[in-house]
Amino acid sequence: MTRIAIVDPQPAVRAGLAMLLRTEPGLVPVGAANDVHDGIELVERLRPDVVLLEHHLLDGDGLSLCRRLKAQPPAPRVILYTAEPDGALVLLARVASADGLVDKAAEPAELFEAIRVVARGGSALPPLEPHDLDAASHLIDPEDLALLAMLVDGTPPGDVADTLRLDRRKVGRRIERLLGRLRAGTAAAA
């Protein structure tokens, strides 16, 4: 059984996802939250295997929530489940250490498969296209290029810190700064 938590600001989406997940053998919705604060509490209390997470939340940013969830052992697997899965979000999802990204317009079978893949330890992130990196390159400080390259390749932040011989807290701050710049740049381009 794969235990799933849902974090989405829309009550109908939370309820609909829970009903949909109950129709699929082996997938069990265990709880839902509508914002960052409640999402953290829910995950700490229920310890789901997978979190379905909207990146636009009422009290903050789902990407930062993803990073927080992934930093606390035992870290759940996280799938960004969003209506805006563009190339910029693929890059942001990788930087935030998300395990998957699924469009809310996808067929249920695609969502179920993504959940199963990430629950087994795999990745359900779409490929990153070269133009996604090109569009973001002007937003990135030269000292963050190595950090970004490692994150995009799927290297966990702790391993990034060890490889770059940096303090883990400093790497965390640099990742948050990088996420902020990329979010601001992609919002300005929209």
Which residues are covered by each model-predicted region?
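Short hydrophobic/Thr-rich beta-strand motif most characteristic of the beta2 strand and flanking loop
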Residues: 26-34, 42
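Helix-turn-helix DNA-binding segment
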Residues: 134-176
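Short amphipathic alpha-helix used as the core "switch/output" element in two-component signaling
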Residues: 63-74
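Active-site residues of response regulator receiver
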Residues: 54-56, 82
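Short, flexible helix-to-coil linker/hinge segments that flank and couple to helix-turn-helix
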Residues: 89-148
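A short, hydrophobic beta-strand element within the central beta-sheet of small alpha/beta folds
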Residues: 75-85
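Acidic catalytic/metal-coordinating carboxylates
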Residues: 35-38, 61-64
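Basic, Lys/Arg-enriched C-terminal extension of HTH/homeodomain DNA-binding domains
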Residues: 171, 175-190
